[in-house]
Amino acid sequence: MSLPPLTLTRRLLPLGLVFLAAGLSLALVGPFLALFLSTSVDAGPVKVTVFLVVGPLAGVATSWAIGRVSDRRPMRRHLLIIASIAGVIGCGLAAVIRDYWALLALTTTAFAVAGALFPQTFAYAREVLQRDDPGRAALGISALRTVFSLAYVGGPPIAALLLSHGGFTAVFATAAVMYALATLVAFGWLSEVEAPAAPEGDQPPPVPAPAASRIRIWLTVAAFTLMQAPMVLGVQALALFIEHDLHGSVGDAGLILGLCAALEIPLMLGLGLLTRRISVRALILAGSACGVIYSAIVFGAPAVWVLLAAQIVNALYIASVSSLGITYVQDMMPAEPGRATTLFTNTFPIGQIMAGPLLGLAQHTDYRWAYAMNFVMCLLGVLLLLATRPAARVSTLRLRRARASGADVPAGDRRPA
């Protein structure tokens, strides 16, 4: 039976604090990592590039391994604690270490383990929501994703303030404190989500939702990767495109990015509410189509004001893919929330790696062509999602009755997922 809304809100409150702390940690460090390496560590362009590629790859591999283990037994709370402690260790050491190779070792160990905090917290939230209020699972995930976005709104300005007063030592030390807060919340406030209790008496066991086929899962992951890369490339190329092609200023780029971020947050919540009336798949397809439209608009934009006007389309694209994509992949793998969430969250660092060489290609041609490449990637992503139409599934009620009586399931009871 579903819990009252207030009880469920209280249940998600500690998860919201974990997301806020983890989000602030990443938002403090991430935007200034290249600056840290080039100024405080004296790393050259090649070393910076290697660091920025090896770090995400190590995070992807570690999160994947932890995601597979996490679904085998009730241990997700312990994994949240371990990942948070790894973040404390990584940021604490980075506050004082200035040797490139030592930092590279840190990013492939402690920071890679800390990266599992994001997907594992979403997986924990999924288990709680599915147990307590399945009808609001997508809304709950969207709300938590919004908290993470809020952290990224406040994180960079806080980091800039810390840099001006205490340098990178203060930045990494503050990030370590945030991870410590996440550790305390996970240790003292969260409980392990146990497996569903066995039914009593002659009641038939609940019928688990079938997982999607392996090919459909991997095609869906490929689609989301193709739609994450344009988000990164679009941001990386924006200031350069505005300055070189539209003859605007860096301030114009900041205004556009700020407007988009401000629109994303209410849109994430609104899309979460819409999932109670419209399927997650339909909303994601519509949002992905917005990515195609936005890329086309920017490619043909004659002035900065066109980009400003198009941010509502861009925000719809980012909000739908970023917030609902997690729920969509989790729905495809209902028995493996940890692995499902990790599969989705890993699409972002892979998209980051893809965006780097594409930006270099745009530098040798024209920055406008970065958005032509975004158009192609978004279009391919939409086509892949359309190609992965869910297979027919069996009516759950009729399936239970048929299993209880030992009869075959009528073909007429099969319906699209």
Q: Language-model features: where?
A:
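Helix-loop boundary and gating motifs at the non-cytosolic
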Residues: 3-56, 223, 231-242
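Hydrophobic core of transmembrane alpha-helices in multi-pass small-molecule transporters
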Residues: 20, 101-118, 225, 306-320
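Interfacial helix-cap and linker-helix signal at transmembrane-aqueous boundaries
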Residues: 37-38, 69-71, 161-165, 242-243, ...
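Helix-to-loop junctions at the C-terminal end of transmembrane segments
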Residues: 61-75, 163, 267-280, 363
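Structural signature of the two symmetry-related core transmembrane helices
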Residues: 78-92, 173-176, 282-297, 375
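Intracellular juxtamembrane helix-capping segments at the cytosolic ends
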Residues: 115-131, 320-333
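C-terminal transmembrane helical hairpin of 12-TM major facilitator-type secondary transporters
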Residues: 281-325
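A late C-terminal transmembrane helix in Major Facilitator Superfamily
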Residues: 335-365
